[in-house]
């Protein structure tokens, strides 16, 4: 099946063409980072306006790069949620209009479902596996038994890991978004320079907490007489990142051991983090687990990642009606098969 996919849940407008749920023919992303960087975070109203300006352009670009005509498209998959309602509605409106005008099936897909299935676009990852979904809005562990079959194993109790990176970056005067900047500084710093807390590591569950690490760094910054810069800044960034990454790795590996799952997928925007990729890779190999990451281009929000689930749902006859609406809050374990049909 030749599928057109649309993503507009936050601050990236994306369209892709995916064949048979695995072959990415194009994946076009229009980023809004420069717009929101001025405000230190995503402004929902601005995000919606920028999506409206970009959505038709990215669709045209995706079709052109894939070298297919609009009439060749056999189905459409679109992010239904979770995310910013106004932003989601732009993608949904475009998807529904195209599905109606072309008389082709439509299916709404969960944003994080796209992320945790993204490695399947590039690698053979047999089910079942443990997925760490880690981004600016999510830090969850899921047991993935198949497409549409997800069970929550653990979750953040407060901030998501990506949110903590962004807040700490703002606190240190590094701007928005913060993940890439901190990762770059951390590579040149001493991760043992400061001992920031590792919350919940001694708890027997698989839940996360990152607000304590962020608060500890805030108190440290307030205790300094001058600005944190130079080698000092690099050491603070490295120590903060080390604390976050260590919590993510230890909790994930503990969950893998106790669930008996031998394969681990790490996905979402924070999966681009070089420190996380290195530590998870080394520790997983040491304990005999296979770990899979999407390539960096499939870690950030993108439309191609919707192709895996979208193709499977449509091939199975699971379609959405044209009255499909956005869901700003939508637990993934309530979004699998046959939920897109409802």
Swiss-Prot record:
<feature type="binding site">
    <location>
        <begin position="133"/>
        <end position="137"/>
    </location>
    <ligand>
        <name>substrate</name>
    </ligand>
</feature>
<keyword id="KW-0408">Iron</keyword>
<protein>
    <recommendedName>
        <fullName>tRNA N6-adenosine threonylcarbamoyltransferase</fullName>
        <ecNumber>2.3.1.234</ecNumber>
    </recommendedName>
</protein>
<dbReference type="GO" id="GO:0002949">
    <property type="term" value="P:tRNA threonylcarbamoyladenosine modification"/>
</dbReference>
<feature type="binding site">
    <location>
        <position position="183"/>
    </location>
    <ligand>
        <name>substrate</name>
    </ligand>
</feature>
<dbReference type="InterPro" id="IPR017860">
    <property type="entry name" value="Peptidase_M22_CS"/>
</dbReference>
<keyword id="KW-0819">tRNA processing</keyword>
<comment type="similarity">
    <text>Belongs to the KAE1 / TsaD family.</text>
</comment>
<keyword id="KW-0963">Cytoplasm</keyword>
<feature type="binding site">
    <location>
        <position position="115"/>
    </location>
    <ligand>
        <name>Fe cation</name>
    </ligand>
</feature>
<feature type="binding site">
    <location>
        <position position="166"/>
    </location>
    <ligand>
        <name>substrate</name>
    </ligand>
</feature>
<dbReference type="InterPro" id="IPR022450">
    <property type="entry name" value="TsaD"/>
</dbReference>
<dbReference type="GO" id="GO:0005506">
    <property type="term" value="F:iron ion binding"/>
</dbReference>
<feature type="binding site">
    <location>
        <position position="179"/>
    </location>
    <ligand>
        <name>substrate</name>
    </ligand>
</feature>
<dbReference type="GO" id="GO:0061711">
    <property type="term" value="F:N(6)-L-threonylcarbamoyladenine synthase activity"/>
</dbReference>
<keyword id="KW-0808">Transferase</keyword>
<dbReference type="InterPro" id="IPR043129">
    <property type="entry name" value="ATPase_NBD"/>
</dbReference>
<dbReference type="Pfam" id="PF00814">
    <property type="entry name" value="TsaD"/>
</dbReference>
<feature type="binding site">
    <location>
        <position position="273"/>
    </location>
    <ligand>
        <name>substrate</name>
    </ligand>
</feature>
<feature type="binding site">
    <location>
        <position position="111"/>
    </location>
    <ligand>
        <name>Fe cation</name>
    </ligand>
</feature>
<comment type="function">
    <text>Required for the formation of a threonylcarbamoyl group on adenosine at position 37 (t(6)A37) in tRNAs that read codons beginning with adenine. Is involved in the transfer of the threonylcarbamoyl moiety of threonylcarbamoyl-AMP (TC-AMP) to the N6 group of A37, together with TsaE and TsaB. TsaD likely plays a direct catalytic role in this reaction.</text>
</comment>
<keyword id="KW-0012">Acyltransferase</keyword>
<dbReference type="InterPro" id="IPR017861">
    <property type="entry name" value="KAE1/TsaD"/>
</dbReference>
<dbReference type="InterPro" id="IPR000905">
    <property type="entry name" value="Gcp-like_dom"/>
</dbReference>
<keyword id="KW-0479">Metal-binding</keyword>
<dbReference type="GO" id="GO:0005737">
    <property type="term" value="C:cytoplasm"/>
</dbReference>
<feature type="binding site">
    <location>
        <position position="301"/>
    </location>
    <ligand>
        <name>Fe cation</name>
    </ligand>
</feature>
């Amino acid at each position: 099946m030749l599928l057109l996919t649309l993503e507009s849940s936050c601050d990236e407008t994306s369209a892709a063409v995916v064949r048979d749920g695995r072959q990415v023919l194009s994946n076009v992303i229009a980023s809004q980072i420069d717009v929101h960087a001025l405000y230190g975070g995503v402004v929902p109203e601005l995000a919606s306006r920028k999506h409206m300006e970009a959505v038709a352009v990215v669709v045209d670009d995706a079709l052109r790069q894939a070298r297919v005509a609009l009439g060749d498209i056999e189905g459409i998959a679109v992010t239904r949620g979770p995310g910013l309602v106004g932003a989601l509605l732009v993608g949904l409106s475009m998807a529904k209009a195209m599905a109606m005008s072309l008389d082709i099936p439509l299916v709404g897909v969960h944003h994080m479902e796209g992320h945790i299935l993204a490695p399947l676009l590039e690698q053979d990852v047999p089910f079942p596996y443990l997925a760490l979904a880690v981004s600016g809005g999510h830090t969850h562990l899921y047991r993935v038994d198949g497409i549409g079959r997800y069970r929550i194993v653990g979750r953040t109790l407060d901030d998501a890991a990506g949110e903590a990176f962004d807040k700490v970056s703002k606190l240190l005067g590094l701007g928005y978004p913060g993940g890439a900047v901190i990762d770059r500084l951390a590579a040149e710093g001493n991760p043992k320079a400061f001992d920031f807390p590792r919350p919940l590591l001694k708890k027997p569950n698989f839940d996360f907490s990152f607000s304590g690490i962020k608060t500890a760094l805030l108190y440290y910054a307030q205790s300094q007489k001058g600005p944190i810069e130079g080698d000092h800044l690099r050491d603070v960034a490295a120590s903060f990142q080390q604390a976050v990454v260590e919590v993510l790795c230890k909790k994930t590996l503990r969950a893998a051991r106790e669930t008996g799952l031998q394969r681990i997928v790490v996905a979402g925007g924070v999966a681009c983090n070089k420190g996380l990729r290195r530590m998870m890779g080394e520790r997983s190999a040491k304990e005999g687990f296979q770990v899979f990451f999407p390539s960096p281009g499939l870690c950030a929000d993108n439309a191609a990642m919707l192709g895996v689930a979208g193709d499977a749902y449509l091939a199975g006859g699971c379609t959405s009606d044209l009255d499909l609406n956005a869901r700003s809050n939508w637990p993934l374990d309530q979004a699998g098969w046959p939920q897109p049909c409802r």
